[in-house]
Curated annotation (Swiss-Prot):
Annotated Gene Ontology cellular component terms: ribonucleoprotein complex; ribosome
Gene3D superfamilies: 3.40.1370.10
Subunit structure: Part of the 50S ribosomal subunit.
Annotated keywords: Ribonucleoprotein, Ribosomal protein, RNA-binding, rRNA-binding
Protein name: Large ribosomal subunit protein uL4
PANTHER family: 50S RIBOSOMAL PROTEIN L4, LARGE RIBOSOMAL SUBUNIT PROTEIN UL4M
GO biological process, one term: translation
Length: 204
């Protein structure tokens, strides 16, 4: 299949495996959930009654004082421990390499089918100015106001990185930094010709 290059009459032949396969919602959902869970720090921690600093002396005598109580570190008291206290743990989920690559291909194919995938010859700016970068995006006419844009380039220069980081709803990444969450969460994805070739080398 061929993809039309924005701002040109030329087309770019691409692999059907990457940009023309059937969309698998279940697979994409599984990979996205696993990716987001793996990104969790899992550092939540609470203290149980045995870990709270405090005396273990019986708070009052056993008889004649109403309900019977022991140490003030029990969960029932203010300042006491937490019942079933949470401990740091890993939320990471294993995803097979073949599954991950298939999900990325499925996302690219669906973006292409919906008309949300655009290809440009190259994307770079000569100066580190946000205004220049914004004008370049506007000249492409690929995204509306308020829409999120993901630009994937084979090489990211310092000028491109600096001029793009202050724009809301715009994310510039290299092929190596691609992930399923960024692809799914973007309204429009713009690929350079060089990025398309690297993506095909990675996924085919």
């Amino acid at each position: 299949m061929d993809l039309t290059i924005v701002g040109s009459d030329n087309t770019l032949p691409v692999s059907d495996v990457v940009f023309g396969r059937e969309f698998s919602e279940a697979l994409v959902h599984q990979v996205v959930v696993a990716y987001r869970n793996t990104a969790r720090s899992g550092t939540k921690a609470q203290k149980s009654r045995s870990q709270v600093s405090g005396t273990t002396k019986k708070s009052k005598k056993q008889k004649g004082g109403g309900a019977r109580h022991g140490a003030l570190t029990a969960p029932i008291f203010v300042g006491g421990g937490v019942a079933f206290a949470a401990k740091p743990r890993s939320f990471s989920q294993k995803v097979n390499r073949k599954q991950y690559r298939s999900a990325i291909c499925s996302i690219f194919s669906e973006l292409n089918r919906q008309g949300r995938l655009k290809v440009v010859d190259a994307f770079d700016v000569e100066v580190s100015k946000t205004k220049v970068f914004a004008e370049k995006i506007k000249s492409l006419e690929v995204v509306g106001v308020g829409s999120s844009l993901l630009i994937v380039s084979d090489e990211i220069s310092e000028c491109l990185s600096l001029s793009s980081r202050n724009l809301p709803c715009v994310d510039v990444r290299s092929v190596q930094a691609l992930d399923p969450v960024a692809l799914v969460g973007s309204d429009v994805v713009v690929l350079t010709v060089g990025a398309v070739k690297k993506i095909e080398e990675w996924l085919v």
